[in-house]
Amino acid sequence: MKAPKSRLTKAQIVRTLKKQNETLNGYSVKRIGLFGSYARGEQTAKSDIDFLVEFERPTYDNFYGLCVFLEKLFKRKVEVITPIALDSIRVAEVARSIRDSVVYV
């Protein structure tokens, strides 16, 4: 009989990210926050992990490299958006909801 796959929690994500400070700095991360279903504690086995990331140097290499790193770290699909992308969301209520729910690490 297979053991059930452990369920990743908001607290585990935050703890894991705090331990990765040096690596995050290598991708020029100024600030990283968790939002979406994991931040609300409503995740399912199929949920991706949503991050709002502010970069010191917002380059393609830093953005893409961070996305790959986070997916390997958490063994799950991630969605990464930046404050600029958040500002471009046309539905103000959606952007406000994200801003209000972000759990910064």
Spell out what each predicted region is.
Residues 1-31, 40-41, 45, 56-105:
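Catalytic core of pol beta-like nucleotidyltransferases
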